[in-house]
From Swiss-Prot:
InterPro entries documented for this protein: CCAAT-binding_factor_CS, NFYA
Protein task: Component of the sequence-specific heterotrimeric transcription factor (NF-Y) which specifically recognizes a 5'-CCAAT-3' box motif found in the promoters of its target genes. NF-Y can function as both an activator and a repressor, depending on its interacting cofactors. NF-YA positively regulates the transcription of the core clock component BMAL1.
Assembly: Heterotrimeric transcription factor composed of three components, NF-YA, NF-YB and NF-YC. NF-YB and NF-YC must interact and dimerize for NF-YA association and DNA binding. Interacts with SP1; the interaction is inhibited by glycosylation of SP1. Interacts (via N-terminus) with ZHX2 (via homeobox domain). Interacts with ZFX3. Interacts with ZHX1.
GO cellular component, as recorded: CCAAT-binding factor complex; nucleus
Record-annotated DNA-binding residue ranges: 290-315
Pfam families recorded: CBFB_NFYA
Protein family (similarity comment): Belongs to the NFYA/HAP2 subunit family.
Gene3D superfamilies named among the record's database cross-references: 6.10.250.2430
Record localization: Nucleus
Biased composition (Basic residues): 294-304
Protein name: Nuclear transcription factor Y subunit alpha
Residues recorded as bearing Phosphoserine in the entry: 320
Top-level division of the source organism's lineage: Eukaryota
């Protein structure tokens, strides 16, 4: 398991993942982090050396692989791992434009680590569902708002969230590049006034706060490629965030609004459908319907005058003065005025 910690001037971010892909959503842009720990290089001193690939701008892409660290200026920077306490491995990366260093800590599976007031607990063996718990017992004040204790439990290795209210989307990837699971939950921590728990790994995810309970359902499948919708929770008028469902490409669109009929019409429609299906199976009628039966009748119907809703006028209604065309009535009135004058 790997841990990515980015220290800035105002606050610290901590991301705990296993080899896969993490997408972190921020206010100004999107930060995508991809970790691959299979390729490692051993230095002359016997320490493990791992490199990063950084592309500046928005979105900011960080890729950990067996290559090298490429900054916005195009200059490669080698990052060397330093062994820490309790069998941990710490890598420090200089960041241009900010004060401080970015630290990447490698934690063996099944080990508990406590650092900077945050506890990271990893449970489960290989091939089983693992649980990652991120806790922040201390109180933080951001933009004049007091943020209380926040606890996040992630099951299924899919969704996580930082203490600043930023969302992390973890998508496991197969060897062939297909995504196993997909989903996203965005919950601004500043908009909630109490402890917050997000659990992922089942069909139903419950988010509880001090003001109420919001239930979110995420499509989660084991080894099946998921093409369902994406659920986003955005702050509403109150303290409880609202839920919006955005269909992803490939999701089935809803059918048109059904036509309402009475019981007699419904049974008659069923009988006609059964009779037509029987004739189509016997080959007596074609399966594709024509636009019209006779072309002459179609032209005649299109030439007839229609009323509101496309209804045809009856002969009596057509001859009545209040059913005439308004333009035609105005022309007749003008003709009478000219004759009188």
């Amino acid at each position: 398991m790997e841990q990515y910690a980015a220290n800035s001037n105002s606050s610290a971010e901590q991301i705990v993942v296993q080899a896969g892909q993490i997408q972190q959503q921020q206010q100004g842009g999107v930060t995508a982090v991809q970790l691959q720990t299979e390729a490692q290089v051993a230095s002359a001193s016997g320490q493990q050396v791992q490199t990063l690939q950084v592309v500046q701008g928005q979105p900011l892409m960080v890729q950990v692989s067996g290559g090298q660290l490429i900054t916005s200026t195009g200059q490669p920077i080698m990052v060397q791992a330093v062994p820490g306490g309790q069998g941990q491995t710490i890598m420090q990366v200089p960041v241009s434009g900010t004060q401080g260093l970015q630290q990447i800590q490698l934690v063996p599976p099944g080990q508990i680590q406590i650092q900077g007031g945050q506890a990271v607990q990893v449970q489960g063996q290989q091939g089983q569902t693992q649980q990652i718990i991120i806790q922040q017992p201390q109180t933080a004040v951001t933009a004049g708002q007091t943020q209380t204790q926040q606890q996040i439990a992630v099951q299924g290795q899919q969704v996580a969230q930082t203490a600043e209210g930023q969302t992390i989307v973890y998508q496991p990837v197969n060897a062939d590049g297909t995504i196993l699971q997909q989903g996203m939950i965005t919950i601004p921590a500043a908009s909630l006034a109490g402890a917050q728990i997000v659990q992922t790994g089942a069909n139903t995810n419950t988010t509880s706060s001090g003001q109420g309970t919001v239930t979110v359902t995420l499509p989660v499948a084991g080894n099946v490629v998921n093409s369902g919708g994406m659920v986003m929770m955005v702050p509403g008028a109150g303290s409880v965030p609202a839920i919006q469902r955005i269909p992803l490409p490939g999701a089935e669109m809803l059918e048109e609004e059904p036509l309402y009929v009475n019981a007699k019409q419904y049974h008659r429609i069923l009988k006609r459908r059964q009779a037509r299906a029987k004739l189509e199976a016997e080959g007596k009628i074609p399966k594709e319907r024509r636009k019209y039966l006779h072309e002459s009748r179609h032209r005649h119907a299109m030439a007839r005058k229609r009323g509101e809703g496309g209804r045809f006028f009856s002969p009596k209604e057509k001859d009545s003065p209040h059913m005439q065309d308004p333009n035609q009535a105005d022309e007749e009135a003008m003709t009478q005025i000219i004759r009188v004058s």
